[in-house]
Curated annotation (Swiss-Prot):
Binding site for S-adenosyl-L-methionine: L76, G108, F127, S128, K129, M130, T131, F132
Name of the protein in question: Ribosomal RNA large subunit methyltransferase H
One example GO MF annotation: rRNA (pseudouridine-N3-)-methyltransferase activity
The organism's taxonomic lineage, starting at the top: Bacteria, Bacillati, Bacillota, Bacilli, Bacillales
Catalytic activity: pseudouridine(1915) in 23S rRNA + S-adenosyl-L-methionine = N(3)-methylpseudouridine(1915) in 23S rRNA + S-adenosyl-L-homocysteine + H(+)
GO cellular component: cytoplasm
Annotated InterPro entries: Alpha/beta_knot_MTases, RlmH-like, tRNA_m1G_MTases_N
Keywords carried by this UniProt record: Cytoplasm, Methyltransferase, rRNA processing, S-adenosyl-L-methionine, Transferase
Organism: Staphylococcus carnosus (strain TM300)
Subcellular location: Cytoplasm
Length: 159
């Protein structure tokens, strides 16, 4: 099994990198894990709707270029499905039983995901109706994926 975290933007702060490295290490006991960053599009502060769409399209093209055809794509979206930790574990486990073994979780940039990326998605996942920095979402996502594996294996951790 392989899990890819595909994200717009680069981690700059050391503390985010350390948190990511810790969860990558922990997840290594359960799955192959890869994090792929695509460059975010430089954009002015007060963009028109058209400019926002252009930024999302360029970032979306970069994301789509990194998704393997056989990968099950799970996009992180505010309007996605909200699950408990146990629900995420069950969702992943059901997909694995169905023979899915390559998962790509996609985290968009500050303007969200382009429609082409949303159309490629097999499942839309939401952690909250709130907006979080994409750097923080990587850590939260990795922690929840790690927690899901612990739950699937019946190992202590998730309480």
């Amino acid at each position: 099994m392989k899990i890819t975290i595909l994200a717009v933007g680069k981690l700059k702060e050391k503390y985010w990198k350390q948190a990511i490295a810790e969860y990558q290490k922990r997840l290594g006991a359960y799955t192959k894990i890869e994090i792929i960053e695509v460059p975010d599009e430089k954009a002015p502060e007060n963009m028109s709707d058209k400019e926002v769409e252009q930024v999302k399209e360029k970032e979306g093209q970069r994301l789509l270029a990194k998704i393997k055809p056989q990968s099950t794509v799970i996009t992180l979206e505010i309007q996605g499905n909200m699950l408990t930790s146990e629900g995420l574990a069950k969702n992943l486990q059901q997909r694995m039983v169905q023979g899915q073994s390559d998962f790509t979780f996609v985290i968009g940039g500050s303007n969200g995901l382009h429609q082409d990326v949303l159309d490629r998605s097999n499942y839309a996942l939401s952690f909250s109706k709130m907006t979080f920095p994409h750097q923080m979402m990587r850590v939260i996502l990795l922690e929840q994926v790690y927690r899901a594996f612990k739950i699937m294996r019946g190992e202590a951790y998730h309480k």
